[in-house]
Structures are given as C-alpha cells and as structure tokens.
C-alpha cells in the first residue's frame, strides 16, 4: 500500500540499538499533514490525495490559493504536495496524517533539494583527476580536452564546471529506526538530502523491503 508524508529536516544524531551499537539517524519533523483534496479515477483519471503541511496566516497566502483552502474547509498551509495512492478512498478531507503512518523497520524513499554549493570545478563537481602538481607542470585542475577536432563543437551532456547542488535528490531504501507520533518525529537511518529545515517528501520505498 502506497503512503507518504511531508516533513522538515531537523538535524542528525545517534541512537543505540539493543546490542549497544551506535546508529546514525536523521531527525525529521514528519507532519502533521492535512488532506486537502481527494482525487479519484472516476472524476480525475487517477487516484491521489493532496496534503498540506505547516500552517500559515491567511495574509501570507494569495487570494486564489486562499479560496482553494476555504473550499476544502481547512486552514492555509505553506506547502501542498500530491501523493498518488490506490487507496485514496480511505482518506477524508480534513484528516490528519501523522508520523505513525510509518513503523520502525519500514523502508522509505526520501526526496529533498540538495545543498547548493555554488559554482564548482570539474574535480569537485564530477570527480575528475587532477594533473601533475610538481614544479614545471602547467596543468593542475583544468578539465582538459572537451571534444575532437572533427565535429568542431562540444557535444551536449559534456561534464564541465558549473553550478553544483540545489537539485532534487531522492535517496532510496532508508530504514525507519523510530517514530514519535506525539512529537511528530521520525528517526531515519543515515543522511537525507538538503539543509536543516529543508522540506522533505517521505514515501514508502519503491523497491520494497
């Protein structure tokens, strides 16, 4: 059964299992999310639910979006995302989705916007090997040849220096170590994309497990 929740990255810490082994975990404020709209195959062509996360004041929302929230009968939210679910009929508008939607031991996929690193060269951005560093060498960190003389142009997709980070990244197959529905917290093994307080989309893993 497909399911998902929105959250914010709080930071990293460690917990200990029953054998005393330290496990690095990311602490995520997961929800509460509120169902804003249900979509069904009969009316929309597919099954899905739209959820809102992080309530905001009405004055911070534009009029079209405020009308959308008023029609649903819910308070305005900063973030709206849609999850495609085969069981969308089980949800009701206004229903809360909390951190207990995922249980310890479940595998999840976490999507976020990676940290922006600004302009970066080929070594940092793509892992290129550098040139000789000894005295007399005039080739250290440059990318080298870009193309052959024949085409007389650079092909699309060539790895070059440029902007690094600030892109959508999904990390698959992370394990839920612990959940705390009372404080809306999820502890997920390992690291997840993005900075602290960055928005995360958490869904059960497409690879199962």
Curated annotation (Swiss-Prot):
It comes from the Bacteria. Belongs to the universal ribosomal protein uL3 family. One of the primary rRNA binding proteins, it binds directly near the 3'-end of the 23S rRNA, where it nucleates assembly of the 50S subunit. The keyword ATP-binding does not apply. The gene is rplC. Keywords: Ribonucleoprotein, Ribosomal protein, RNA-binding, rRNA-binding. This is Large ribosomal subunit protein uL3. Gene3D superfamilies: 3.30.160.810, Translation factors. It comes from Moorella thermoacetica (strain ATCC 39073 / JCM 9320). It holds the Pfam family Ribosomal_L3.
């Amino acid at each position: 059964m497909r399911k998902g929740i929105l959250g914010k990255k709080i930071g990293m810490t460690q917990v200990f299992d029953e054998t005393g082994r330290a496990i690095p975990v990311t602490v995520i404020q997961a929800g509460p999310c509120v169902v804003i709209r249900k979509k069904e195959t009969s009316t929309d062509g597919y099954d899905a639910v739209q959820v809102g996360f992080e309530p905001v004041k009405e004055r911070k929302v534009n009029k079209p979006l405020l009308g959308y929230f008023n029609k649903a009968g819910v308070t305005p939210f900063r973030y709206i995302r849609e999850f495609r679910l085969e069981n969308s009929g089980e949800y009701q508008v206004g229903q809360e989705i909390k951190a207990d939607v995922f249980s310890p031991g479940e595998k999840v996929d976490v999507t976020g916007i990676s940290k922006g690193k600004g302009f970066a060269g080929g070594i940092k951005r793509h892992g290129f090997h550098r040139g000789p560093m000894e005295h007399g060498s005039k080739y250290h960190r440059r990318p080298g040849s870009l193309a052959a003389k024949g085409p007389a142009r650079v092909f699309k997709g060539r790895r070059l220096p440029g902007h690094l980070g600030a892109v959508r990244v999904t990390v698959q197959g992370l394990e839920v170590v612990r959940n705390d529905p009372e404080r809306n917290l999820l502890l997920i093994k390992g690291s997840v994309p993005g900075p602290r307080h960055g928005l995360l989309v958490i869904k059960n893993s497409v690879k199962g497990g």
